[in-house]
Each structure stands twice: as C-alpha cells, then as structure tokens.
C-alpha cells in the first residue's frame, strides 16, 4: 500500500509545473481590481488591500437593511488569468476582527458582490468557491481555512494577529486547504459550480484591511 501511495504521488508531481510567483512584489501586473478597494505594494513587496477611508457614507434617510448592504459591499483583486487545477500558497495578515477570503474558479469576478446594490445570494462564496480568512470577525462561525458554506475548518489553526501560511490544492475532484501545516478543510467540489476561473483576494467590507505576501502558484496538468 505504501508503494502504491508513493507511486500515485510521484505521478501527480510529475504532472505539476514548477512553483511560480503569482504576485511580483512590485506592482499589480497580472491582476485586476474589482470594486472600490485600494490596492498597493509596500516597500518590502507586501501586497496591501484596504478600503477608501474617505468613501462617502450613505445618506441619512436609509433604512437599517440598506445600511448593512452598504457596509458589506465587497471589493476584490483578481488574477487576469484563469486556472483549473493548481496548488496555491500564500501568507496573509488580518487585524483583529478582520475578514477576507480567497476566491477560486470565480468566473463572475465578484460582479454580484461589488455592484450597487450588492446581491449577497450570488457572491463568490455561493457562485464558485471561497476560502475563508477570519481573525475573529463577529458572528461568523467559519474559521480561517474553511471552504465557505461547504466545509468548516476547526478553530485554533490560525495564529492570531500574525502572519499565517495557507496552502490550497485545487483538483477536478477535490479542494484541500492546509493552514499553518495542518489540514483545515476538504471538499469534493460541486459540479454545478465553475470548473475553471480566476483567483481572487477579498476585502470583505468597507473597513477591511488585509496584507498578502509570498503568493505562489503551481499549475497541474
């Protein structure tokens, strides 16, 4: 059995290309901002995403529900290229209460989450796949590493208020998430969702701040 497993692993690796940087550490080449997020590259090559602090608040005659929709309108940064089978590795940092995510195979490019008003029934987490990144966001039971709405990660895998490494394997019949070296979640995938598409980084709401570094991809043929 051990020899069979090793043989399968060897075949899998033989069809995988070398690791390549998905973010060059200098600018946003190869990426497309979606929504009103402010994306920049810091001096050390870290990718910083935040929302505009000078954004106009809603008018004073809005209802509570309209305000909630305004507050939670999303912003994203997507790869221009699309991918089907691959390994993705990156490190992320969120402040206390921060909420972000990684979209997989999202051919909608978050169209429904960034429009006015947003349609939260068709966000990337529901249209395609989203890997949750969550540093204690109030009321959200999906811990970091969860495949949102499909497979929940256990609590305690994330290092609070520090950099965390997440590794995602995307195959035809499985999505697998490893957070800080520990298995977080697995799911066989949903045949009703896209089989290929871009990769996206999320700014969940109008107060989100997130940082990313060492973003790499290994395409599997």
Predicted features and spans:
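Sec-dependent signal peptide recognition
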Residues: 1-7
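Hydrophobic h-region of N-terminal signal peptides that target proteins for export
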Residues: 7-16
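Carbohydrate-interacting regions of secretory-pathway proteins
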Residues: 17-221
């Amino acid at each position: 059995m051990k020899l069979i497993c090793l043989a399968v692993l060897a075949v899998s690796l033989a069809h995988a290309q070398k690791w390549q940087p998905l973010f060059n550490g200098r600018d946003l080449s190869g990426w497309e901002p979606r929504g009103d997020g402010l994306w920049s590259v810091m001096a050390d090559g870290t990718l910083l995403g935040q929302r505009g602090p000078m954004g106009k608040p809603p008018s004073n005659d809005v209802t509570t529900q309209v305000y909630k929709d305004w507050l939670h309108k999303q912003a994203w940064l997507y790869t221009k290229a699309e991918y089907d089978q691959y390994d993705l590795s990156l490190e992320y940092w969120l402040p206390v209460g921060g909420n972000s995510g990684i979209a997989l195979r999202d051919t909608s490019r978050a169209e429904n989450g960034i429009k006015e008003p947003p349609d939260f029934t068709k966000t990337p987490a529901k249209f395609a796949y989203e890997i949750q990144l969550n540093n204690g966001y109030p009321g959200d039971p999906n811990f970091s590493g969860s495949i949102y709405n499909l497979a929940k990660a256990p609590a305690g895998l994330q290092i609070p208020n520090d950099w965390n490494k997440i590794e995602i394997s995307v195959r035809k019949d499985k999505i697998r998430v490893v957070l800080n070296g520990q298995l977080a979640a697995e799911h066989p995938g949903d045949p009703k969702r896209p089989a290929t598409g871009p990769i996206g980084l999320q700014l969940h709401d109008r107060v989100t701040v997130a940082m990313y570094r060492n973003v790499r991809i290994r395409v599997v043929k």
